[in-house]
A protein has these predicted regions:
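Extended alpha-helical scaffolding segments
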Residues: 1-5, 9-38, 65, 70-356
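Beta-strand elements of modular eukaryotic interaction domains
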Residues: 43-45
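Flanking scaffold residues of small Cys/His-coordinated metal-binding clusters
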Residues: 47-50
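Short functional micro-motifs and their immediate structural scaffolds
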Residues: 60-63
Length: 356
């Protein structure tokens, strides 16, 4: 009974001090009708009062979404101190990748890394609600979490839901916690970019977002770490195979998702999803030679696409058409044509038995 009373009384993942934050209607909270720069919502999944309110279970789910993918529309409230730029929510700044299993339990185990940063044990779990002192100030820089629960529950936004007659009708939002994304390898579910060493700066890595116009196989080198840092969940699954927890013939389904923000990141303008299937061994030491072969073929496709685009542009120009989008349209059609054949070829590779 006491637990039930606590659930009713306490506010899930909310911060009372956020009541001074930027006010938003329920549409801001609901990711299914998350507002873009387009003011008219066409073919919306909600209409009438349903757009202006949420049930408590709905609000709890979308609270997690807003914390991780919020744009930068919320304004700074503190007047007496200089605050850093907020930036989008943490997941909105990542090129998210995760491994899809045969069922929910399998998926969770494939992505629940017991080691961080390529080998070290996580520190003792400390979710945000178990900190010695709750963080309530806006836009607070903190160290990169050293425990998995801390990473998964970090409050990138301070949010307080508005309730009326058993419904959630809106929220107020402040900027929350953030950490330096440079070499933040505690984050296991992202692609990485590499910044080469310069005269005054050592080499470092930072999260790589997905290109909205690129199929996932075109980012193959980022999955393997050939030219960058291998995503943590990919490394984890290859480790499970090396330890014989997963079979040598294990097939891997990699899912990717991401979002794109508009000017100044004030609104979300597009979203990205893709999936890719291949033998897990292709991403392991056993598949090193094949990794180079696949990357060569990706590069060959890129060069062919450039040639197709150039040819289309020259033919269009010869016909008197000076449309600047001709080349890009031809490249897009080229990739659409080869997309499925390339995926099927990648899926069919068995690095243990197939010859290069």
């Amino acid at each position: 009974r006491r637990q039930r009373q606590m659930c009713i009384r306490d506010s899930f993942w909310q911060v009372p001090e956020a009541k001074i934050g930027s006010p938003f209607r329920a549409k801001k909270l609901n990711g299914e009708i998350f507002e873009s720069e387009n003011k008219d919502s066409l073919f919306s999944a909600y209409s009438g009062e349903a757009k202006e309110r949420l049930t408590y279970p709905q609000a709890a789910r979308w609270l997690v979404f807003l914390n991780n993918y919020d744009d930068t529309a919320a304004k700074k409230k503190a007047k007496d101190r200089t605050l850093p730029s907020m930036g989008p929510g943490w997941l909105g700044r990542l090129g998210v990748v995760y491994v899809k299993g045969a069922n929910l339990f399998d998926t969770l185990m494939r992505n629940l890394m017991f080691l961080r940063d390529g080998g070290k044990l996580w520190e003792e779990d400390a979710p945000c609600w178990e900190l010695d002192a709750a963080r309530t100030e806006e836009r607070t820089e903190v160290p990169c979490p050293d425990n998995f629960a801390g990473l998964m529950t970090m409050q990138y936004r301070r949010i307080l839901l508005k309730r009326q007659e058993g419904w959630v009708t809106g929220c107020t939002v402040l900027g929350g916690d953030f950490f330096d994304s440079t070499n933040a390898f505690a984050e296991p579910m992202t692609l990485w970019n590499k910044k080469e060493e310069s005269k005054n700066n050592p080499r470092y890595y930072y999260p790589r977002v997905h290109s909205m116009s690129k199929q996932l196989w075109r980012e193959f080198s980022a999955l393997t770490g050939i030219d960058s840092h291998v995503p943590g969940v990919i490394w984890w699954n290859t480790l499970l195979q090396n330890e014989k927890i997963l079979s040598r013939k294990e097939h891997l389904q990699i899912c990717a998702l991401g979002v794109e923000y508009g000017k100044m990141s004030n609104s979300m303008t597009d979203c990205y999803t893709d999936q890719l299937s291949m033998e897990l061994a292709l991403l392991n030491e056993l598949g090193r030679a094949w990794q180079s072969r696949v990357e060569d073929e990706v590069e060959n496709c890129e060069q062919a696409a450039q040639c197709v685009g150039r040819l289309a542009w020259e033919l269009s120009l010869a016909a008197g058409d000076k449309n600047d989008t001709t080349a890009e349209s031809a490249r897009t059609q080229f990739y659409f044509t080869i997309d499925q054949p390339f995926r099927l070829w990648l899926q069919s590779i068995d690095p243990e038995t197939d010859k290069l």
